[in-house]
């Protein structure tokens, strides 16, 4: 397995100013970085890809729908079309960057609720969007990994089983699921068993502790997580995802109101040391 870290620990938009951070990540021994793709031009992400190539860092990309005007499960077909266009753009950015994966909750706008559980129409619309995006992804050599969240952030997909069922419905080789241990800690009765049940559908893993701080400093049993991944033959990426207060808009979006670690660099150092002992 390769170990990576999500750049959301530092920023929502990676620019040339972050090259020293990327160099530090490489020096610490990370194999890859996860780049958030929320705004900007495709050409910019091609530049980011070249910086990472020069450093010898592989990359994945993360996404989210945040604008109600681009909602995969809106009753308005024009709004759903805008969501598909956004996901196509994110796939194009990943391809330009040389990233093999786009990961995230690609099924609804974050934090937007209807007051009820998912409807048949919403599930159908979300599957239609993914099926359409999968063709673009396949042509770009990109895999889409559906990220289940939790009931406080979404209503459509909160467990690995629901993500797996949805992937089966989409039925495309470029679509799979991912594990995020923070969300699983909230929603799964047994995270390790959920991983074993999802099995071959798992394409990506976020290592994130219960307080979004340093992995291993909280309550989650990462040993059980890694053993479950070993049991299904998973040999993909483990990406550290943590959030702090350095970027106010990210702190607000992730509801991080207190410091849970000394510094981002210290977290990155401690996280790779912690994960390396399991691999």
Regions inferred by a protein language model and the residue ranges of each:
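Histidine-acidic metal/acid-base catalytic patches
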Residues: 1-9, 15-27, 98-100, 157-179, ...
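N-terminal small/glycine-rich loop or linker at the start of catalytic domains
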Residues: 1-9, 61-74, 106-115
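Active-site-proximal loop/turn and secondary-structure-junction residues that shape catalytic pockets
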Residues: 9-11, 37-39, 65-68, 108-110, ...
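Catalytic domains of carbohydrate-active enzymes, especially glycoside hydrolases
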Residues: 19-39, 90, 96-98
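Glycine-rich, proline-tolerant flexible connector loops at the mouths of alpha/beta enzymes
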Residues: 32-55, 106-118
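Short amphipathic alpha-helices and their capping/turn segments at secondary-structure boundaries
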Residues: 39-56, 85-98, 127-135, 192-197, ...
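Active-site acidic/histidine proton-transfer and metal-coordination neighborhood
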Residues: 54, 77-176, 188, 258-266
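A short acidic, helix-capping loop that chelates divalent metal ions and anchors anionic groups
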Residues: 68-74, 110-116, 153, 186, ...
């Amino acid at each position: 397995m390769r170990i990576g870290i999500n750049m959301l620990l530092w920023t929502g938009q990676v620019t040339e100013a972050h090259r020293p951070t990327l160099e530090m990540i490489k020096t610490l021994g990370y194999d890859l970085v996860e780049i958030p793709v929320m705004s900007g031009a495709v050409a910019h992400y091609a530049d980011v890809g070249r910086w990472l190539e020069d450093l010898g860092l592989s990359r994945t990309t993360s996404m989210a729908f945040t604008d109600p005007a681009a909602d995969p499960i809106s009753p308005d077909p024009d709004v759903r079309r805008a969501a598909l266009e956004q996901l196509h753009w994110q796939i194009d950015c990943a391809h330009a960057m040389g990233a093999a994966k786009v990961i995230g909750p690609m099924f609804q706008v974050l934090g937007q609720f209807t007051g009820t559980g998912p409807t048949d129409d919403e599930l159908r619309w979300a599957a239609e969007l993914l099926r359409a995006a999968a063709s673009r992804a396949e042509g770009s050599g990109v895999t889409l990994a559906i990220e289940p969240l939790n009931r406080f952030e979404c209503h459509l997909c909160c467990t690995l089983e629901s993500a797996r069922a949805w992937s089966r419905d989409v039925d495309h080789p470029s679509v799979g699921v991912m594990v995020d241990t923070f969300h699983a800690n909230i929603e799964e009765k047994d995270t390790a068993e959920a991983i074993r049940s999802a099995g071959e559908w798992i394409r990506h893993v976020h290592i994130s502790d219960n307080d979004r701080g340093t992995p291993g400093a909280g309550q989650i049993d990462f040993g059980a997580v890694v053993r479950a991944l070993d049991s299904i033959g998973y040999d993909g990426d483990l990406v550290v995802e943590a959030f702090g207060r350095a970027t106010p808009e990210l702190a607000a979006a992730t509801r991080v109101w207190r410091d849970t670690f000394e510094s981002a660099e210290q977290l990155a150092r401690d996280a790779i040391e912690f994960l390396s002992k399991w691999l």
